[in-house]
UniProtKB/Swiss-Prot annotation:
Catalysed reactions, as listed in the record: tRNA(Thr) + L-threonine + ATP = L-threonyl-tRNA(Thr) + AMP + diphosphate + H(+)
Organism superkingdom: Bacteria
A GO BP annotation: threonyl-tRNA aminoacylation
The EC number(s) this enzyme carries: 6.1.1.3
Location in the cell: Cytoplasm
Quaternary state and interactors: Homodimer.
SMART domains: tRNA_SAD
Species: Hyphomonas neptunium (strain ATCC 15444)
CDD domains the record matches: TGS_ThrRS, ThrRS_anticodon, ThrRS_core
The keyword Amino-acid biosynthesis is annotated on this UniProt entry: no
Protein name (database record): Threonine--tRNA ligase
EC main group: ligase
Keywords assigned by UniProt, alphabetized: Aminoacyl-tRNA synthetase, ATP-binding, Cytoplasm, Ligase, Metal-binding, Nucleotide-binding, Protein biosynthesis, RNA-binding, tRNA-binding, Zinc
CC terms in the record's Gene Ontology section: cytoplasm
Length: 657
């Protein structure tokens, strides 16, 4: 007999050879009907695969995250089968699950087109209707290679040959006559796959991500547990398209990119005005929280990066400045004569350690909270660049806290409060937290890791925050906290960082004198609230759909004159508003007021102050708010007080209350 422990702690006995499906059927027929797979001793398991001994078993349905991942995994297989049935000259390569969907890379001489999608989706539905049993088969490495080669599947054979150790068995999954290399698990049959799937787009992808290899065709799709979830997802995508920060950046004249500076942003006056507001805001928070601000070099010698460990672990992501500029047809090589190899900094932390080391430090000096709006460069692959979200030149609201080990919990709690305050001020109050724990490859002792993980967990608990554990996902030098934010249309973004580091102070020989008179290593806490200004601005643009709160808006008020006669009063009102601290433009063009209002609304100006002859005579303003059809007529003096107060940043409003 096999003893099975269920999630509620209860135990049941089953005959040898029982499967998770037998377990589900013994609980209820409805659960068996909903069952897609199982977790056996924490590992995903095919629903009909026999259990191999006593085990804990949890049934997976489409209500579980693992169930949705399984649906998407099977959708990728059904896609590959449909493509090969329709286009037999196609080779399959890889087809993983990704956020909200899946993709499959195909090798085919003729290019696919999005016009092919309807035909492919129709065949996918036919495969679902056929309800082919999905059968797990085990093959030896040599047999598997021979099998795939006999089918002309050179890519699959190469994967097996390169990745699978000699003598190790592999699994394939068969559905009808079609099969694929896969570790599984899968649904019991293709009929279990909901038809709530849709092909989305095509892209090119190099085999194994190497530009020296052949270009494949990547077909993206999305799959959900039911039609409603699919429809909701497609609606979110439509809304996200409207909010795309790259489109809004051009529409609102905030920034642009160009080929001569890939991954680096050209900030326009309006975009940089928002940047300045963000920088001033976060600087005030850090000043109030006891941070000191520093500025460190961008270009440092390779010897420096060798000491920090970045030269060996991060060099491929660094921009290296050679000592020699190669010759051209008309010029000889240019030599600096210094014989140095330099690199632009990819991060600020090693430079901050140098400032810490530049003075004798005592335990009484700690903690030292050192902040920098540091410009960093990372040599991201061209294909990975994505607007403001993924750039090569970035500015971080970076800070490092040098503290004693007994101060870790307090400093963590202090940062969590700062983080929640800041994100609440931007309307991003739905935050989930993860504690990423020790990875297999790590520095430090288990005792040190125990203390560090406990300190972070205790701080989260003390702050009243619910958190999940991301086992093994910490950095090699220490555990970290991950912050996941939900925006206005339900998308999740990972922002900000908080990482505990025992390694860098050791590598760079940072020390302080303890209360015992001996030298000790400080603990280094890496933290950022925004992360990078570029990415945070991209998130804000999309979260607000370009309609920024008044305090952030690059143009806060437009005074629009109805007639030429009101032009002088429009200028007078604008001057008074500017004196009150507002960013104001005047529109006296010979256009209708409706045209002006419409144009400034497209530019997302939050307040349009309309003035005509009557307003000029009465010294009033007719205020129209973005998104509202009505207007509020108030005196200029009242408008000055009300708008100046409304335009204050949230922290400045709190300071006045």
């Amino acid at each position: 007999m096999i003893n099975v422990t269920l999630p509620d702690g209860s135990k049941r006995e089953y005959a040898e050879g029982a499967s998770p499906l037998d377990v589900a059927e013994s609980i209820s027929k409805s659960l068996a009907k909903k069952a897609l797979a199982a977790k056996v001793d924490g590992q995903m398991w095919d629903l009909v695969r026999p259990l191999e001994g006593d085990a804990s078993v949890a049934i997976i349905t489409d209500r579980d995250p693992e169930g949705l991942e399984l649906i998407r995994h099977d959708a990728a297989h059904v896609l590959a089968q449909a493509v090969q049935e329709l286009y037999p000259d196609t080779q399959v390569t890889i087809g993983p699950v990704i956020d909200d969907g899946f993709y499959y890379d195909f090798a085919r001489k003729e290019p696919f087109s999005t016009d092919d999608f309807d035909k492919i989706e129709a065949r996918m539905r036919e495969i679902v209707d056929a309800d082919y049993p999905i059968v797990r088969e085990v093959l030896g490495k040599d047999e598997a290679i021979a099998t795939f080669k006999s089918l002309g599947e050179e890519y699959k054979a190469q994967i097996i040959d390169d990745i699978i150790p000699p003598g190790e068995q592999i699994t394939v999954y068969r559905q009808g006559k079609w099969f694929d290399l896969c570790r599984g698990p899968h649904l019991p049959s293709t009929g279990k796959l909901p038809k709530a799937f849709k092909l989305m787009k095509l892209a090119g992808a190099y085999w194994r991500g190497d530009h020296r290899n052949e270009m494949l065709q990547r077909m993206y799709g999305t799959a959900w547990a039911n039609e409603k979830d699919l429809k909701d997802h497609l609606t979110r995508l439509e809304e996200a398209e409207k909010r795309d920060h790259r489109k809004l950046g051009a529409q609102l004249d905030l920034f642009h990119f160009q080929p001569e500076a890939q991954g680096s942003v050209f900030w326009h006056p309006k975009g940089f005005m928002i940047w300045r507001e963000l920088e001033a805001y976060i600087r005030r928070q850090q000043d109030a929280d006891g941070y000191v601000e520093v500025k460190t070099p961008q270009l440092l010698n390779s010897v420096f990066w060798e000491k920090s460990g970045h030269w060996s672990k991060f060099r491929e992501n660094m921009f290296v400045v050679p000592d020699e500029i190669p010759s051209t047809e008309s010029d000889a090589p240019i030599l600096s004569g210094e014989g140095e190899l330099m690199a632009l900094k990819p991060m600020n932390c090693p430079a901050h350690v140098q400032i810490f080391k530049n003075a004798q430090r005592s335990y009484r000096d700690l903690p030292i909270r050192m902040a920098e709006f540091g410009c960093c460069h990372r040599n991201e692959a061209h294909g990975a660049l994505h607007g403001l979200m993924r750039v090569r030149q970035m500015t971080q609201d970076d800070a490092h806290i040098f503290c004693r080990e007994d101060q870790i919990a307090d400093e963590t709690l202090r940062f969590l409060k700062l983080f929640e305050t800041v994100y609440g001020d931007f309307g991003l109050s739905e935050i989930s937290y993860k504690l990423a724990t020790r990875p297999e490859m790590r520095a430090g002792t288990d005792e040190t890791w125990d203390r560090a993980e406990k300190a972070l967990a205790d701080a989260l608990t003390a702050a009243g925050m619910t958190f999940s554990i991301a086992e093994g996902e910490g950095a090699f030098y220490g555990p970290k906290l991950e912050f996941h934010l939900t925006d206005a249309i339900g998308r999740t973004w990972q922002c900000g960082t908080f990482q505990l580091d025992y390694v860098l102070p050791e590598r760079l020989d940072a020390e302080y004198t303890g209360s015992d008179g001996a030298k000790h290593r400080p603990v280094m806490l890496h933290r950022a609230v925004f992360g990078t200004f570029e990415r945070f601005m991209g998130i804000l643009i999309e979260n607000y759909a370009g309609s920024f709160p008044l305090w952030m808006s690059p143009v806060q008020v437009v005074v629009a004159a109805i007639t030429d006669a009101a032009g002088d009063y429009a200028e007078e009102a604008a001057a008074a508003l500017r004196k009150a601290g507002l960013r104001v433009e005047v529109d006296k063009r010979n256009e209708t007021i409706n045209y002006k209002v419409r144009e400034h609304s497209v530019q997302k100006v939050p307040v349009i102050a309309v003035v005509g002859a009557r307003e000029a005579e009465d010294r009033k303003l007719a205020l129209r708010r973005l998104g509202s059809n009505g207007q509020q007529i108030i005196s200029l003096d009242e408008a000055l007080v009300a708008l100046a107060d409304e335009a204050r940043a949230p922290d400045l409003k709190r300071a006045r209350s």
